[in-house]
Amino acid sequence: MSVRGYSGVQVISSRKHRSMSRLPTVLLLLASAAVLAAGGQEATEDPFADETDQCQISVSAETMKSLHGGSMQPDGTCDNLWESFLSQFHQVRENLTACQERAAAGPAPDPSSQFCQQLLDDAQRQMEQEHRQYAATLEEQLHAAQQETQQEQEMKKALQKQLDALTDSRNALYIDLLLANIAIGETKQALSYYNLMPASMPIDKLHEQIVRFVYRVTIYQDQRLLNLMRFVRDIPSVEERRSLYQLAQREVQKRPSQRDGYVAAVYALSVREDLPVYQANRQLYDDLVRQSETRLKEQVANGNFKQAAELAARQPQHFRQLQTSLATIELKHWRKFDRFVPYANALPQPAQRLEVLRVLLSQIGDREKKTSHKYLVKAARQFDICEQFIGRGKVDQAVKKQLEELRGKFATFAKGKNYQHYLSESRKSSG
């Protein structure tokens, strides 16, 4: 069925278009028609304007009925029908707009959901509060633990400091006892304290301290050095012995009183007796021994017996290694015989004196066979002094036997002249 157009728009309802029955499509068409109608009304206001193009929309009767909820009258006028369409369209549009806004704003909360949400929020707040309280408690406990740990660390440091101080005091005491025993010659006791030194203590520093102590007091330095030599021999470590020997040698070389005296000889002979140390650098110690021996021989030849006598008294074992050499007068000093001959009785022990007399008589026989008289007279005088010295003490049979052998030696130089002859001559010359 065809209906007259409204404002340039025709709406045609025909049964042969029943296939177009979906509401969204019709609404779209109606919206388009409304726009076109508005434009058409504006155009018709001008009486001289050409007639606008008409838009024809075909709507089935079933669709029209569905739009009106089945209440549409088929015989209604087109204007009424169109007004009804527009009214319903606007209503639907408003409903759709409101629905869209509600959808965008979110669904309305359900009262039961609101209650559950409140419970959930309360539980969340309570959990957060408990969490804050628990975190605060843990923070306090952690702070207390840190303070306790710091206090314990401070106590530990204080105890360690006290322990270190006690250890230092103990080590200082050991060193003092070590040095004191070296000073008095108690080498075994000194070695026991030496072995108590901690491994953490640098051994070279300890050795330097020992040697400095030896030379701390000048009047005691010779005896302390001799004690040190005896102490060093008992140290098990070859390297430690070598270290102490080298430090001592430097000090000996600095001091003429030791370098030119018997102390240097004792030092060098001590090192030579220590084979592991001596073999490491023999030339160094051999040179020192020769230098010391040469100086002592020069002193004895010039009538200076002090150093040789001290060596014989303080280090008889070391003196024994040099006594024959010291008793032998070099040819260039033979003319100083008068100065040299009293050397025999400058020595402290009978065996040492007899050895000098033996070497002296042997040299007279080798050098002055034909002109021995004046030398034997002087030798007889020293023999008499030696015999009196031996008679005042207790001596073994070996010394007495050697004394008689030397007495008989005087008779071998000239026929009919014995010891008594030369002794009488010496008493005459001395007046």
Curated annotation (Swiss-Prot):
What does UniProt note about where in the body, tissue by tissue, this protein is expressed? Female saliva (at protein level). Female salivary gland (at protein level).
Coiled-coil region(s): 120-169
**Any further remarks?**
Monoclonal antibodies against saglin/SG1f fed during blood meal inhibit Plasmodium yoelii sporozoite invasion of mosquito salivary glands. Monoclonal antibodies against saglin/SG1f fed during blood meal inhibit Plasmodium falciparum sporozoite invasion of mosquito salivary glands.
Q: Spell out the subunit comment.
A: Homodimer; disulfide-linked.
Query: Where is the protein found, in the record's own terms?
Result: Secreted
Name the record gives this protein: Saglin
Reported consequences of knocking out the gene: (Microbial infection) RNAi-mediated knockdown results in fewer Plasmodium falciparum sporozoites invading mosquito salivary gland.
**Upregulation:** Induced by blood feeding (at protein level).
A cellular component term, taken from the record's GO annotations: extracellular region
Organism field: Anopheles gambiae (African malaria mosquito)
Function according to Swiss-Prot or TrEMBL: (Microbial infection) Facilitates invasion of mosquito salivary glands by Plasmodium yoelii sporozoites.
Keywords (alphabetical) are: Coiled coil, Glycoprotein, Secreted, Signal
Glycosylation site list: 95
- Extract the signal peptide range: 1-39
